[in-house]
């Protein structure tokens, strides 16, 4: 079963792999049914294909709310490295996913915000850098507002 899950998420047919990831993400908003595969999703963060990394970021973020075992503690550092992923689209996806992680795991908010502050975005083209900075500002605003309301 879990081999099938990873195979479906890494399939050559990006359309079906994306649809499968969307199903997992959507269902994970309502149920912890996919959390048992958390450790199987983690290696996908380092997949050579950025589309697979994007899927893994969102799936893990969607399952952060079910993480009573604190497995996220073991992966937060690796997750945060994708703020400056080699692919700017993946960096943007990571930054957006971190809003969900921070809302589910408020103890990470200071680390997330600190990672934003010290992220070196100089490797990105001038056309992408402002978009990444805007994503950081939006996620920062979400997390700071959450911190104020709690």
What positions do the PLM features span?
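Helix-adjacent hinge/juxtasegments
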Residues: 48-88
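Amphipathic alpha-helical scaffolding segments comprising HEAT/armadillo-like alpha-solenoid repeats
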Residues: 1-9, 32-43, 69-82, 106-120, ...
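Alpha-solenoid HEAT/Armadillo repeat architecture
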Residues: 10, 46, 65, 84, ...
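Hydrophobic core positions within HEAT/HEAT-like alpha-solenoid repeats
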Residues: 20-22, 38, 56-59, 95-96, ...
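Short inter-helical turns and helix N-cap capping residues of alpha-solenoid HEAT/ARM repeat scaffolds
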Residues: 12-14, 48-50, 86-88, 124-125, ...
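Structural signature of alpha-helical solenoid repeat scaffolds
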Residues: 25-26, 61-64, 99-100, 117, ...
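N-terminal alpha-helical scaffold/docking segments in eukaryotic complex subunits
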Residues: 1-32, 136-150
């Amino acid at each position: 079963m879990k081999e099938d899950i990873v195979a479906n998420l890494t399939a050559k047919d990006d359309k079906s792999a994306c649809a499968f990831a969307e199903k997992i993400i959507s269902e994970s908003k309502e149920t912890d049914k996919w959390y048992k595969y958390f450790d199987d999703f983690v290696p996908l963060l380092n997949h050579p294909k950025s589309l697979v990394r994007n899927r893994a970021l969102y799936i893990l973020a969607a399952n952060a709310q079910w993480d009573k075992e604190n497995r996220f503690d073991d992966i937060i550092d690796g997750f945060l490295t994708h703020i400056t992923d080699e692919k700017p689209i993946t960096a943007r996806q990571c930054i957006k996913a971190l809003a969900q992680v921070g809302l589910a795991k408020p103890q990470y908010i200071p680390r997330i915000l600190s990672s934003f502050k010290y992220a070196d975005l100089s490797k990105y083209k001038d056309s992408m850098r402002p978009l990444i900075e805007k994503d950081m500002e939006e996620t920062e605003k979400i997390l700071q507002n959450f911190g104020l309301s709690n």
